[in-house]
Each structure stands twice: as C-alpha cells, then as structure tokens.
Amino acid sequence: MTMASDDQKPARAGFCMSGITDFADGISAIDTHHIRPASDASYLLIREGRAAFVDTGTALAVPHLLAALQEKQLTVESVDWIFLTHIHLDHAGGAGALLKHLPNARVLVHPKGAPHLVDPTKLIQATIGVYGEAFFAATYGKILPIPADRLQVTEEGLSFFWVDRSYQCLHTPGHALHHYVLWDPIARVVFAGDNFGVSYRELDVNGHAFVIPATTPTHFDPSEMHRTIDRIVALQPAAVCLTHYGQVTEINRLAEDLHRGVDAYVAIAGRHGAGPDRVRRMGDELFEWMSAQLDAHGDRADAKTRHAALDLDIDLNVQGLIYWADRVAASKLSGT
Ligand SMILES: [Zn+2]
C-alpha cells in the first residue's frame, strides 16, 4: 500500500446553525439534510468572488444550497461550476434543479455518468431498486434532466484552471465506475465523493475520525477500491472532503482503516455471499465488525446508538457486496 508521512493533526471546524461548516482555502461544507443532519454534504468553493459546488445532494437540497450562496453574499450568477464526483442521486440528484437557478454554471461529470444526467430515467429506476419507492419519493425530490450543452465530461487526469489555480480530475473506480475525484494541489485537498469511505462526525472520538468503506450498489470492486484509496494517499493531501460527511485529516491512518475494512467486507461476503438469508446474516456480521472497530476506536456508544448511525450504510453495503459476489460468481460460471 502507498504510504506517506503522516504528520497531520486532527483539525475540525465547528458546525454553525445554518449547516455550513467553513474550512481553509474558501471551502465550505453545506449540510444537504438528506436523511438526517450531517449525513450528506455538498461543498461550496469560493475563489475571488466566484463560486463552484462539488456535489449537490438530492433535489430537496436545492433551497439549502441557494441559502448558502446568499449567506456567503454570492449571486447565482457567480457560480461557474457544479462538479459531480459521481452520479449516485444522493450527490447528483439536485444538479438539474440547481442548474435552473444558475445561469452561468456548467456541470463536470465522468463520461460514464453524462448520458444518465441527460436522461435520468434509468438512474431513477436503479435508485428506486436500491431504496424502494416510498423512501425514494420521500427523500429524493424531483430529478430533472440536465441539458447536454451544459455538461462537460472529464477525461482521466484532466487539469483545468479556475479563477486562480489549477485543479485535476482523476478517474477513480471502486465505489462507482462513473466516479472521479477533484484534487486541489494548492490547498492540498481531495474532494473524494464516496471514494474515501463514510465518516460521521457523531462517531468521532477526541477529534479522531472513524471511517468505513462505502460499497453501495452496483459497481463495488474491491481491487479498484484499494487502488483508488492508494491513489488518493499518493497525492499526500492535507485533508479529504467526504460527501458523508465533512473534511477529514489523518489521511494515512484512515487509508489503512479503509484497506482493512474493504478486506473485512470481502471476507464477510465470502462467508455469506451465496447462502440463504444472506442479507440478514451479512448485515449482522457487518454490524458486529463495525462495533468491534468502534470499541477499538474508543467509542462508548451503546448498540442502539450505533445502529441509528450505521444501519442505512450497512443495508447499502450489504446490497453492494451481494451485487459484487454475484458478479464474481457469474464470471466464474461463464469462465470469463
Ligand atoms: Zn455513492
């Protein structure tokens, strides 16, 4: 695994009432209020009066994003970009609705994601397949298509200049085939989407983050996820911005935790991936594994509190592991 010197200290900014958390270098996390507070973030980047969003949350997040612009005394005309790290609808679902308010903004997306933003029908159906119709209706809002002429696709390694500095996009499969990360080499910050795990601030112990991999359906691939984690570490970032949730430091320790987590998930899937009642058994074992990690992390919360924080992720991770296990089994059967 790629290693770099780990001299970063945990640094955390305070959350303010509006759900905006300010970090260094004109970066703010905006709580999109998806599912529960501090669960799903959009990032607002501000450079010399110009603005960009990294991910948007769902369509229901749009009022929060517009309010954040207002709070920062920015106009809707000042937004140049919406960077979508990937097109899962808890991060890209609001882009079409937000774009209607932003006359000058364009959307940067992975080439595999672009067609599904122009016509989101399949994306909506797939998301309903994962979460169920009632949950989707209550938590995602109306997903609007994005006009093709406002989309730009990012090639692997694309560097581009915005306002006062260069940024780079790296294609990073593992969580999703349509995923890229955005790298700001001056701030030394990676916007990692879901590629550097999920880490909720309610599970911090003494300012130290707890992180677990996100193996959401349907593209989870463990070897690609290991590679992507290493690729992020190799950049030697001072901080990584996660969609779930906020900015984390101590990158090398978290990367090691993520590598171990991916291996643990795969072992659990291997034990239960083809058996009857596998969803329940994999879910139970994932919770036990996470609980043991939390104990070692110094967390003292009871099982009920841990279930409240982790159950949705466990459900998604199990579904993603099953997709992966079935894909591996099918490829063995067909000899590919
Ligand atoms: Zn995702």
Map each language-model feature to its residues.
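Intrinsically disordered, low-complexity segments enriched in serine/proline and basic residues
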Residues: S5, P10-F15
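Conserved beta-strand hairpin/beta-sheet module of binuclear metal-dependent hydrolase folds
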Residues: M17-K72, L182-D194, V198
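Metallo-beta-lactamase
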Residues: T58-L60, L117-H171, L177-C241, Y245-T249
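Active-site metal-binding motif and surrounding structural segment of the metallo-beta-lactamase
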Residues: P63-V109
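Short histidine/acidic/glycine/proline-rich micro-motifs that form metal-
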Residues: K112-H116, Q247
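Internal alpha/beta domain cores that form substrate/cofactor-binding pockets in large enzymes
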Residues: T218-L235, V240, V248-G283
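C-terminal regulatory/interaction regions
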Residues: A267-T336
